[in-house]
Amino acid sequence: MDAFKGGMSLERLPEGLRPPPPPPHDMGPAFHLARPADPREPLENSASESSDTELPEKERGGEPKGPEDSGAGGTGCGGADDPAKKKKQRRQRTHFTSQQLQELEATFQRNRYPDMSMREEIAVWTNLTEPRVRVWFKNRRAKWRKRERNQQLDLCKGGYVPQFSGLVQPYEDVYAAGYSYNNWAAKSLAPAPLSTKSFTFFNSMSPLSSQSMFSAPSSISSMTMPSSMGPGAVPGMPNSGLNNINNLTGSSLNSAMSPGACPYGTPASPYSVYRDTCNSSLASLRLKSKQHSSFGYGGLQGPASGLNACQYNS
């Protein structure tokens, strides 16, 4: 009974006051192995309990945060949609009508950098938005600058050839026309005054060469023409030539020094004058050669060998 009472008393004692039961000898290792698992059980239970207790908190927290998350998700979706919309808007081109382009071009010709107020006015006139007008002016200025730059590059690249050709052309004119006419043709007109100073004896035998130079009527009247020359006039030719040269008046000299008769000047009709003078000089020389050969004056043509081709032909 006492033992029963003692057992009853131990059973009635609270669990915290009960002494631990003595471990059996054969169950020692199993007890030690199972012992560390004992404290884990309450941890797992506590973890499970904490998870159980936290789940409703998350559920409770998820309930108020749901709209925010959904709102954030909505904004996120909206944010994802907005860039797509913006990209689509950027890729979308604005097709301007001819009237709008005319108005924009006219305004661009007047002012290439319109301010905000002017752009707004243009937008009202053209039925466009102000950003679209601003973008159009920006693109138009870029196109204008590119065109100006290309024009400057073209001028710089092609500027050397016109300058070179401009420098060459005057020289070609000088050598082709100026040199061949102004010098050679002038020499064909100039042998009379040169020969009167250097070759007086030869000039005395050819008064027609001076006639080609002095075109004054008085000098022509004082000289004999080739048609009037005959065999009877040849013996008196030296004296008549010297008399004609000595009888030249100031008027004939002034006419010889006039700009029209100047050997370095350009006559009004150069080719016709040059052709006439060449024909007359050649005809006179042929006539004189025939006359000199007929009267035995062939030796008088010796001084002509010292002249150049231009003076000899004249």
Swiss-Prot record:
It is found in: Nucleus. One of its GO terms (biological process) is regulation of transcription by RNA polymerase II. GO terms for cellular component: chromatin; cytoplasm; nucleus; transcription regulator complex. Residues 147-279 are annotated as: Interaction with PIT-1. Belongs to the paired homeobox family. Bicoid subfamily. This is Pituitary homeobox 1. Residues 17-26 have a biased composition (Pro residues). The modification Phosphoserine is found at residues 46, 48. Residues 85-94 have a biased composition (Basic residues). A motif (OAR) lies at residues 280-293. A motif (Nuclear localization signal) lies at residues 286-290. It is linked to Clubfoot, congenital, with or without deficiency of long bones and/or mirror-image polydactyly: A congenital limb deformity defined as fixation of the foot in cavus, adductus, varus, and equinus (i.e., inclined inwards, axially rotated outwards, and pointing downwards) with concomitant soft tissue abnormalities. Clubfoot may occur in isolation or as part of a syndrome. Some patients present tibial hemimelia, bilateral patellar hypoplasia, and preaxial mirror-image polydactyly. Liebenberg syndrome: An upper limb-malformation syndrome characterized by the combination of dysplastic elbow joints and the fusion of wrist bones with consequent radial deviation. Keywords: Acetylation, Activator, Developmental protein, Disease variant, DNA-binding, Homeobox, Nucleus, Phosphoprotein, Transcription, Transcription regulation. Its main location: nucleus. One of its GO terms (molecular function) is DNA-binding transcription activator activity, RNA polymerase II-specific. InterPro entries: HD, Homeobox_CS, Homeobox_Pitx/unc30, Homeodomain-like_sf, OAR_dom. The modification N-acetylmethionine is found at residue 1. It comes from the Eukaryota. Sequence-specific transcription factor that binds gene promoters and activates their transcription. May play a role in the development of anterior structures, and in particular, the brain and facies and in specifying the identity or structure of hindlimb. Interacts with POU1F1. Residues 89-148 bind DNA. Residues 55-68 have a biased composition (Basic and acidic residues). PANTHER family: PITUITARY HOMEOBOX 1, PITUITARY HOMEOBOX HOMOLOG PTX1. Residues 1-103 are annotated as: Disordered.
